Amino acid sequence: MKYNKWKMKRTIEKAYANAIKKLIQGLQDELKNLDSPFLITSTIKSLARQPTFIKKAEALAKGMVTQLFSDNVKSWRQAANKGSQGKMIYKELQKGLTGQIRVTFNELINQNANYISSLPLDIAKYVDRRIAKGVLEGKRAADIRDEILRYYPHISETRAQLIARTETRKAQTALTRVRAQAIGLNWYVWRTSEDSRVRKSHSHMEGVLINFNYPPSPERLINKKSYGNYNAGDIFNCRCYPEPLTDINDIKFPHKVYYGGAIRNMTKNQFLKIM
């Protein structure tokens, strides 16, 4: 697979997942001293409400979004050196973190901080279910407590990985889109990670031209259960990403274009009429 400047570095996702996992597993130390499993849920909720925990969640979110923003700017600079929209791109980059780009930047930080802050509450719900199951099975309170503490690292790791994988991609798509549309570029090429793990409903989207304002429902296009309409990278567990169309000469026509609810093969002239 050839290098693509718009593809997010996997290290950002890994670092984010590890940081979230470390933060959540740090709460486990407070749980080890509890004698009763019935105190675990209330303790987790109490710890999650502490200002220190909330500040740490905000710091992790800001670190991830800032790293993505920095990498995204580098990608746009590379695009400016090559594409026909170079002057417009440079002009936009000179504005820095202002306008709608700043709004999106702050929204992404707030959203991610909220996801991390709510993670202990999700774990608390899981703990409640484990306690109820243990009680129904007639297990001793001490055994239920030990079982919960044994599973806690696995739960926190799984949740951390899901948040990191989903939210880093969503943030990348949001940052790419807001910059593209500030320049006046509404079209992009849907790119997949081009490996065996690409879901079937996304593999047929590879290379298709999409308008950011009119995203497809990839599942509906192949008669599968729909998760709604969304852009590349903008749904759970998705590793796809948008490659902004900065130069129409980069596209070999006829080309696949998503338009009017379907994927169509279009000539250059046909595409120019809807562009």
Regions found by a protein language model. Give the residues of each.
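Acidic, glycine-rich two-metal-ion catalytic cores of nucleic acid-processing enzymes
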Residues: 154-258
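N-terminal leader/targeting and assembly helices and adjacent pre-domain segments
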Residues: 1-155, 246-275
